[in-house]
UniProtKB/Swiss-Prot annotation:
Stretches annotated zinc finger (C2H2-type): 43-65, 71-93, 99-121, 127-149, 155-177, 183-205, 211-233, 239-261, 267-289, 293-315, 351-373
Single annotated GO MF: zinc ion binding
Miscellaneous comment: Significantly enhances POU5F1/OCT4-SOX2-KLF4-MYC (OSKM) mediated reprogramming of mouse embryonic fibroblasts into induced pluripotent stem cells, and can also substitute for SOX2 in this process.
Record-given protein name: Zinc finger protein 322
Pfam families associated with the record: zf-C2H2
Native source species: Homo sapiens
GO BP terms in the entry: positive regulation of stem cell population maintenance; regulation of transcription by RNA polymerase II
Compartments, record wording: Cytoplasm; Nucleus
SMART domains assigned: ZnF_C2H2
Family as reported in the entry's similarity comment: Belongs to the krueppel C2H2-type zinc-finger protein family.
Expression (tissue specificity): Ubiquitous. Highly expressed in heart and skeletal muscle.
Chief location category: cytoplasm
Modified residues annotated as Phosphoserine in this record: 391
InterPro entries referenced in this protein's UniProt entry, alphabetically: Znf_C2H2-type, Znf_C2H2_sf, Znf_C2H2_type
Length: 402
């Protein structure tokens, strides 16, 4: 017989032992694995012949063989072997992070995640990616990171068959099907499907711009916009086209460019069934179907009220934009601004393209310039049927390419 103290010491040691299942070869961590018989109470697993001193430990072992996971999450239907695993998982949905780091005040769902994070303060990162050499404090973080190299997306949406590399991304995606928006803004009552979207939105009320560039002192509300901006200074273009090896600073620019090679035109007009490579081109085209603004003098129609106002100035010979230096007048405000900039020889160029660092006075000039890089020719001449990168002088007689 063992004294209570001896039994306690034996159990403490046994908690630290990992056991390998002889049938499946899996490493399993079982509390109080039986090595020495205690009080004659032995529970043996019929599958792998392992012995245990507690019935609960035997049940856990048997579930590794049967695959049974009786604890189910009501939010995402994920299942677990132990109730404690379910409890930890549910914190993801509730955004509950009870484990806080004393060094930097970061908080975590699970105590193991906190332990992994604390290694970063100690300078210890034990898990290294074999492909790119990045280090991680937790094996789970390394596993998720490796999916960026392998392209593995193990989390499947049962509604639309979309796949995701993270379970949290799947949870958020499912809300697009259910319409659930659990995160509500207290200022304007706008609701969002993700907490990060709510946090970003709240900055429109507070004016907070936490992401600041140390090169030019520009600041941003969103981290993603900040990352894209930094590439202006570094010249980094991480997104490469596999067909022509052109590189881009933004993934969205690469996606649009690739349509030049594939011929894909995902934006379709429901009126005439014409298709377009860009959503902006579709919106501009759709306006041609609804000529709602008419000139009473010539019965000419326009897509925008601003175009009608400019047209009417021709009849009235009105030039509302006056230049004080020489009393020149302009029909269009944009012509006046352009002339003003030219005469003052200002170097203010507000619209900058990150691919080649060229800058422009007007957003329309920037949009036209972008077509040079992606190889798109959105305008077609009705006379020669040639594709053009820029709108031809006889733009009224030219229609956009589908």
């Amino acid at each position: 017989m063992y004294t209570s103290e001896e039994k306690c010491n034996q159990r403490t040691q046994k908690r630290k032992i990992y056991n390998v299942c002889p049938r499946k070869g899996k490493k399993i961590f079982i509390h109080m694995h039986e090595i020495i018989q205690i009080d004659g109470h032995i529970y043996q697993c019929l599958e792998c012949k392992q012995n245990f001193c507690e019935n609960l430990a035997l049940i856990m072992c048997e579930r590794t063989h049967t695959g049974e996971k009786p604890y189910k999450c009501d939010m995402c239907e994920k299942t677990f072997v132990q109730s404690s695993d379910l409890t930890s998982h549910q914190r993801i949905h509730n955004y509950e992070k009870p484990y806080k780091c004393s060094k930097c005040e970061k908080s975590f769902w699970h105590h193991l995640a906190l332990s992994g994070h604390q290694r970063t303060h100690a300078g210890k990162k034990f898990y290294t990616c074999d492909i790119c050499g990045k280090n991680f404090g937790q094996s789970s973080d390394l596993l998720v990171h490796q999916r960026s190299h392998t392209g593995e997306k193990p989390y499947l949406c049962s509604e639309c068959d979309k796949c995701f590399s993270r379970s949290t991304n799947l949870i958020r995606h499912r809300r697009t099907h259910t319409g659930e928006k659990p995160f509500k803004c207290l200022e304007c009552e706008k609701a969002f499907s993700g907490k990060s979207d709510l946090i970003s939105h709240q900055r429109t009320h507070t004016g907070e711009r936490p992401y600041k560039c140390n090169k030019c002192e520009k600041s941003y509300r969103h981290r993603s916009a900040f990352i894209v901006h930094k590439r202006v200074h570094t010249g980094e273009k991480p997104y490469k086209c596999g067909a022509c090896e052109k590189c881009f600073g933004q993934k969205s620019d690469l996606i649009v460019h690739q349509r030049v090679h594939t011929g894909e035109k995902p934006y379709k007009c429901l009126e005439c069934m014409r298709s377009f490579t860009r959503s902006a081109n579709l919106i501009r085209h759709q306006a041609t179907h609804t000529h709602t603004f008419k000139c009473l003098e010539y019965e000419k129609s326009f897509n925008c009220s601003s175009d009608l106002i400019v047209h009417q100035r021709i009849h009235m010979e009105e030039k509302p934009h006056q230049w004080s230096a020489c009393e020149s007048g302009f029909l269009l405000g944009m012509d006046f601004v352009a002339q003003q900039k030219m005469r003052t020889q200002t170097e203010e160029l507000h619209y900058k393209y990150t691919v080649c660092d060229k800058s422009f006075h007007q957003s329309s000039a920037l949009l036209q310039h972008q077509t040079v890089h992606i190889g798109e020719k959105p305008f077609v001449c009705n006379v020669s049927e040639k594709g053009l990168e820029l709108s031809p002088p006889h733009a009224s007689e030219a229609s956009q390419m589908s």
